[in-house]
Each structure stands twice: as C-alpha cells, then as structure tokens.
C-alpha cells in the first residue's frame, strides 16, 4: 500500500484538494477536486486525473457549510473512498510566511499563532489558508501538517530588491518586499528545466496572470525580482486589486474622503483592479468579449502595466532569454499573450500566431531572440513535493512518517 499526501488550498468560499500517491521517487496524482460554495450551497466534486467524476455531493443551502465542517466532510470522504489510512501528511498552501519562514514548516499550535500574525499582510488569503490547518490539528493532531509558503521562493533576491527606502528600524521589523506566487514560479522554473534547459539556466521572466497577477524575474532557477512586494496588492492591476499605487493617494483618501483603514483596504483589495476600471467585471474573459469602453480600457491598462514591468524586470536581469505565460489568463488568453508579445518586440520577442492560438508549449518563432512558452502551473504538485521532502528530512526511523501512518490508521 502506497503512502499518500493530501494537498489543501483554501480560499474564501472553497477548499481545493489534491491527493498524490508515492510511486518510487515520484508522486502520482490520484484525485483532485474542491468543496465550493461554502457558507451558501456547498458542493463537493472529486475527479480522477483523467477528469472522470469520482464523487459529487451537494449540501442544502440552509446548512451554510463553513471551512471547518467542509474539512470534516472531506476527511470522511477520503477515509471512505480512497484508503486514507495511507495518508502520511497534509500540505497546505499558505500565502505569507513573513521573514521567519523561508521554507516549508511543520505546523503546531505555536507556529499557527505566528502565521496568524501575518493575516494583516494578506487579508484575502491568509485567514482562509489557516482555517483547514487549525481544523486538522484538532481532528488529527498526530498527522503532520506542513505549511508551504508563496513567499519562500523569493528569498534568493538580492537585498536591494527586497528593500523599501524606509528607515532601517522598519526594515528590521519586517517591512520589506516579500513577493508572492512563489510556489507557481518554483514549479515553472522546475518544468522549464525539462522543456528548455538553455532558457532555464538563463534569464527568464514568468508571467503568472490570473485573478491575482504578478511577474517574476528568474535567473538559473532563482528569483531575482518580482512585481509584488509587502502585500499581494502591489504590482499589476488584478481582478479586484489595484496593483501599484502612489502612497499619497491613500493619505489623500483618508484626509479628504474620510476613509479609515478598513475603507481603504476594501477599496484596494475588493473594488479596484479590472473591476474598478471597467465597471463591468473582474473576469478577464468577460472583459475581452465586451464592447464596453470601460472593459476595453481595463484590458489596455492590464497589458500596458505588463509592458512596463517586462522592461523593469529585463533590466534587473541584464537582458532576457525567455518569457513564460502561466495561470488562468496567461495559459488561456491568446489575445493577452499576443498584445503583450507585440509590445515586447523591442526585446526580440516574436511569436507564431498559430502556436499562440493553440496555447501550449513554445509559441515563439524559430527566429525569435527570446523563447516564449505557455506552461500551465501546478502549485499543488509543488506543495506535495515540499511536504514529502520535509517529512523525509525531519524524521527518524520511528519518526514523523511512522507517527502519521499510525494516526491515519486509527482515524
């Protein structure tokens, strides 16, 4: 019987899950799915790697299933349907590890308390990321819970790339540029090594374009600079997040529009970005297909900001060898890729129209000085690998894995 690792990625209204089985030195996906519609009409959907339906269940809306109850049902489902006695650990995506956690960590109540102090730095994500950990610690305390952070990958950046021009005491207090989407960038860097070793060992800019969007300059697999900083609201305009903003705007809003910190937070995180500019939608698919002038303006601003950040990140790399598009928009919006690459012709970018329309693999021409790739990300697999490696490196012959097997068997 093979060991299994469960990966959880909790959002505000859903818990996404993936189960991986050990196959020698590799991890094979066994199932994936989510419980969506939390606090409304919750629904569990589980699928096999070939996308065939494994299980489906809907709860009455009046139950208003929350994160804790959803995780209870998920654990029950795993135990009943996928031999959960093999489960040796749970890996969790956690957006912010601060300056304290620069790699995966096994979470206990003490670590959980520290992670809760980072909630103000990632208010849209961190509270929901931590809820399943808290529930799992209470229900299966002997089963290892491993937190994997979106901030860790960026700790290889030079000091100047992580600094704000603020007094040293504030920097020492942890006010710095952390960067995010690190699990995605780490996966892309690893995958690019397999697909294009020359590009992977050179200077690459990865565009993680989704409802949350950022860009990262990577050299020889290491983060050099990124567009997100202290929080995940900086950088590119996103679905509902503003992206870069003159701090003076915030002071002005507070002084002249009587906005308090909660008002400003709500504005920057939930009312701005593509939604705020367009007045139509936060969904890029809707905006691309809309004739509304506001929608067209939002798309134009999104591409313009990417154009500026490409130049900035290419400068940080002293040149450019490859561009990779990933995440929901990056992997599925040929129009955005075409506009971005058209604006990057000065860097030596030239894409093949047919390859771009197909949207998989290398989409640049044979004569392009910069290789351009479309690579779907897989943060869940990255978390599973980190979890297994952490358990392997932090065990004795009678250590964590044996405890986990014993705990899972008796759960």
Language-model region placement:
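Glycine-rich beta-strand-to-loop/alpha-helix junction loops that act as flexible
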Residues: 10-11, 93-96, 209, 320, ...
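Internal helix-turn-beta structural module
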Residues: 296, 300-321, 330-399
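Phosphate/pyrophosphate-binding loops at sites that engage ATP/ADP/AMP, CoA/4′-phosphopantetheine
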Residues: 76-88, 192-198, 310-321
């Amino acid at each position: 019987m093979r060991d299994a690792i469960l990966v959880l990625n909790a959002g505000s209204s859903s818990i996404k899950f993936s189960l991986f089985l050990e196959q020698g030195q590799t991890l094979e996906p066994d199932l994936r799915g989510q419980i969506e519609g939390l606090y409304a009409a919750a629904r569990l959907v589980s699928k096999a790697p070939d996308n065939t339906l494994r299980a489906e269940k809907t709860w009455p809306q009046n139950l208003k299933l929350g994160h804790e109850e959803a995780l209870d049902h998920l654990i029950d489902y795993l135990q009943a349907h996928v031999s959960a006695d093999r489960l040796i650990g749970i890996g969790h995506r956690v957006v912010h590890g601060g300056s304290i956690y620069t790699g995966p960590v096994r979470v206990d109540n003490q670590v959980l308390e520290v992670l809760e102090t980072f909630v103000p730095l990632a208010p849209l994500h961190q509270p929901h990321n931590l809820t399943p950990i808290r529930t799992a610690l209470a229900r299966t305390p002997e089963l290892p819970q491993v937190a994997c952070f979106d901030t860790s990958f960026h700790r290889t950046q030079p000091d100047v790339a992580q600094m704000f021009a603020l007094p040293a005491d504030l920097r020492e207090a942890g006010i710095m540029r952390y960067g995010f989407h690190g699990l995605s960038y780490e996966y892309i860097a690893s995958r690019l090594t397999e697909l294009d070793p020359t590009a992977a060992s050179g200077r690459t800019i990865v565009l993680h374009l989704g409802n949350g969007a950022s860009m990262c300059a990577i050299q020889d697999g290491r983060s050099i600079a990124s567009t997100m900083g202290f929080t995940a609201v900086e950088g590119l305009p996103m679905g509902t997040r503003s992206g870069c903003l003159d701090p003076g705007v915030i002071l002005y809003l507070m002084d002249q529009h009587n906005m308090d910190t909660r008002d400003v937070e709500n504005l920057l995180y939930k009312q701005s970005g593509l939604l705020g500019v367009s007045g139509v939608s936060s969904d890029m698919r809707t905006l691309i297909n809309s004739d509304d002038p506001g929608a067209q303006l939002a798309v134009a601003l999104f591409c313009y900001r990417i154009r500026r950040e490409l130049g900035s990140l290419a400068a940080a790399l002293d040149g450019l060898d490859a561009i990779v598009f990933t995440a929901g928009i990056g992997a599925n919006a040929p129009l955005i890729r075409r506009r971005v690459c058209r604006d990057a012709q000065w860097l030596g970018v030239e894409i093949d129209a047919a390859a771009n329309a197909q949207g998989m693999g290398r989409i640049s021409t044979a004569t392009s000085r910069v290789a351009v790739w479309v690579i779907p990300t897989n943060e869940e697999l990255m978390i599973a690998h980190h979890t297994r490696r952490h358990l392997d490196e932090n065990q004795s012959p009678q250590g964590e894995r044996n405890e986990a097997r014993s705990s899972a068997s008796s759960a």
